[in-house]
């Protein structure tokens, strides 16, 4: 049975500055409390929902929905080292039974000229049906651990409206930015700064997903993938000397 989180406090303006604007709200459902900071950026076309939940209920599936009003029969979902398209309509009984499907950092619904990406930093149960995008936030099941989701949760999900389809809109890069945010640090002034990377590639559709020491201790292993299903040539730049390269 669906329930709406109707006990919502009036929005409070928490921050208002040149970097971002933050509006805070809280929702109460049964014995649980969910607090959210909704973050708007002047120079970033993304809205973040920084969420903190003190969850005390069992057998309640907490979900969020965004009515997208986008005309598309297929949606794209990120999987490991790529993406997959799935239907947005239910034509068979097994489609109806799949109230959600798995995706990693993003899911996207696009039509010609525009689209909406739903990003997250740790939630993987998605649904996109009839123009509505949903994301499962807390499951609160009781098996095998009867108190698996009881306690404090902190996570962020975002909406990213964009022009064109997700490939041109840099949805993948935006999802990586959410999951690996920029970290700043103060350091003594020592002249002009510079840029150095141990490994980089020169194509925006290619990602260095992993770098590790070889198990025999002789060299490094790189895992690089192309994320837009396009043919491309790339150059791998290494910040150290190498003797030879092997393709695994």
What are these regions (language model features)?
Residues 1-248:
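C-terminal (or distal) subdomains of carbohydrate-active enzymes
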């Amino acid at each position: 049975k669906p329930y709406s989180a109707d006990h919502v406090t009036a929005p409070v303006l928490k921050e208002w500055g040149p970097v971002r604007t933050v509006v805070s709200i809280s929702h109460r459902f049964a014995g649980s409390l969910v607090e959210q900071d909704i973050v708007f950026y002047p120079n970033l076309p993304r809205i973040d929902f920084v969420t903190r939940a003190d969850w005390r209920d069992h057998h309640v599936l907490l979900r969020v929905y965004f009515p997208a009003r986008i005309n598309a029969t297929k949606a794209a979902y990120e999987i490991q080292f790529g993406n997959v398209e799935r239907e947005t309509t239910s034509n068979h009984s097994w489609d109806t039974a799949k109230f959600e499907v798995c995706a990693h950092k993003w899911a996207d619904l696009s039509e010609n000229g525009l689209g909406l990406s739903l990003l997250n930093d740790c939630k993987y149960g998605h649904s996109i049906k009839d123009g509505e995008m949903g994301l499962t936030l807390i499951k609160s099941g009781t098996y095998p651990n009867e108190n698996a989701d009881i306690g404090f949760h902190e996570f962020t999900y975002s909406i990213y409206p964009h022009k064109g389809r997700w490939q041109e809109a840099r949805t993948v890069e935006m999802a990586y930015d959410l999951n690996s945010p920029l970290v700043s640090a103060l350091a003594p002034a020592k002249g002009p700064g510079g840029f150095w990377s141990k490994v980089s590639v020169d194509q925006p559709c290619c990602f260095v997903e992993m770098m590790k020491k070889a198990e025999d201790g002789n060299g490094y292993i790189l895992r690089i993938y192309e994320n837009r299903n396009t043919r491309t040539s790339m150059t791998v730049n290494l910040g150290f000397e190498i003797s030879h390269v092997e393709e695994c």
